[in-house]
Amino acid sequence: MTDISILNDIQKIIVLDYGSQYNQLIARRIREFGVFSELKSHKITADEIRDINPIGIVLSGGPNSVYADGAFGIDEEIFELGIPILGICYGMQLITHKLGGKVLPAGEAGHREYGQSALRLRSESALFAGTPQEQLVLMSHGDAVTEIPEGFHLVGDSVDCPFAAMENTEKQFYGIQFHPEVRHSVYGNDILKNFAVNICGARGDWSMDNFIDMEIAKIRETVGDRKVLLGLSGGVDSSVVGVLLQRAIGDQLTCIFVDHGLLRKNEGDQVMDMLGGKFGLNIIRVDASKRFLDLLSGVEDPERKRKIIGNEFVYVFDDEASKLKGVDFLAQGTLYTDIIESGTETAQTIKSHHNVGGLPEDMQFELIEPLNTLFKDEVRALGTALGMPDEVVWRQPFPGPGLAIRVMGEITEEKLETVRESDAILREEIAKAGLDRDVWQYFTVNTGVRSVGVMGDGRTYDYTIAIRAITSIDGMTADFAQLPWDVLKKISTRIVNEVDHVNRIVYDITSKPPATVEWE
């Protein structure tokens, strides 16, 4: 059996996309159980599902009514495939509507629910095995089921929802009116695991080790003896892609690392030493710092900064790529979330596909995106499985424009140096305190504000540095990290004593929303 054939034998649970903001969380939670899961369009046909051969199907939630014009439907032959189905929120209403039950708009049914609610189990169910008879769940629905289809029976209700959970054990169809994928549903993970393992019979055969074997085989089959180009940023995603490609095709890979002069302290050298030295990647380092800083001189508007950096990065990359001969493929660190966030027919675009969108139209490469089925935490797990050290795998997220958006106002060498040095101190002290895995993201910002201070016997008028540290689960929302006061005090003392032109430290205690993580 070839490594590629293993991919076809891996058990899969597919999630049909009906537009819920939580869709990717469903797939992510299922993967945590060692079961491969991915989103598919709600327009998928029964024949297409037969080709995929999943062990289970989840119908996601969504913002629409089953009675609305253009409401998202389902190929009803899917109900005849003999595959277990779990309908979540809109998915439960769709099952009910298509199989002969009744769904009413909230105004008529009187059962609108938003927020946490107490679910009461009225009968035993394999879906709820090991969970308490009463449990908190997250409800978010306008319409409501008022009559369940023939062959189904009631499993659970809530004060405002007479049919909060239902099942047809003969067909292995299950419907729940709440969202088990979010953490506000206290036993949601147990419910999803019961569906995957106890009902669908998942054996948990999805792991990073078999992903590596399959992806290497896939890369070798796709590339053959041709050459691949990778734009290396030093971040986690492109670094993991580089190491994976190196293992797959060796010296057929060439990496271009554009140093725009906006990196963190010693970051350029660390990239070269680690990826070029330890892992043997063939890296062309381009020192374009003067080129970028000259273009940014006098620019204060953050959007102009971003556009200048983005455009110039493409020009520099294109210049270097044009010097290479016989390259057929461009590799990118596109993640599954990038593809989802690019927008689907069921959801608005959150952001454009940043990896592809900025490339010149005349760059005629075939794309290789080895990580495009993985979430961020899975990329870190992949890096660890590839033998990459923690300092690379757990590197702090870093924006494409680099320190340019952590310097408020005009960018100068002096301001950049204050951020580089203060950020290095912050990262060092967070690590020393053992908090580097607990805090989602942390960095410093030169606020562009000067204030009066006293150092020694002299008056100073220097920059104010802000510390930003957040906790989060998925990055969509965030709270400021409540760092211990002694740690903050040490960080502040070190920065004002060790970093020139800084005399004041402030701590950003704003959540997201209303603030964003980055200041610009």
From Swiss-Prot:
SUPFAM superfamilies: Adenine nucleotide alpha hydrolases-like, Class I glutamine amidotransferase-like, GMP synthetase C-terminal dimerisation domain. Its EC number is 6.3.5.2. The lineage of its organism: Bacteria, Bacillati, Bacillota, Bacilli, Lactobacillales. It holds the Pfam family GATase. Residues 206-395 form the GMPS ATP-PPase domain. GO terms for molecular function: ATP binding; GMP synthase activity. The active site is at C89 (nucleophile), H179, E181. GO terms for cellular component: cytosol. Residues 12-205 form the Glutamine amidotransferase type-1 domain. This is GMP synthase [glutamine-hydrolyzing]. It catalyses: XMP + L-glutamine + ATP + H2O = GMP + L-glutamate + AMP + diphosphate + 2 H(+). ATP binds at S233, G234, G235, V236, D237, S238, S239. Coiled coil: none annotated. It comes from Streptococcus agalactiae serotype V (strain ATCC BAA-611 / 2603 V/R). Pathway: Purine metabolism; GMP biosynthesis; GMP from XMP (L-Gln route): step 1/1. Keywords: ATP-binding, Glutamine amidotransferase, GMP biosynthesis, Ligase, Nucleotide-binding, Purine biosynthesis. Homodimer. The keyword ATP-binding applies. Catalyzes the synthesis of GMP from XMP. The keyword Amino-acid biosynthesis does not apply.
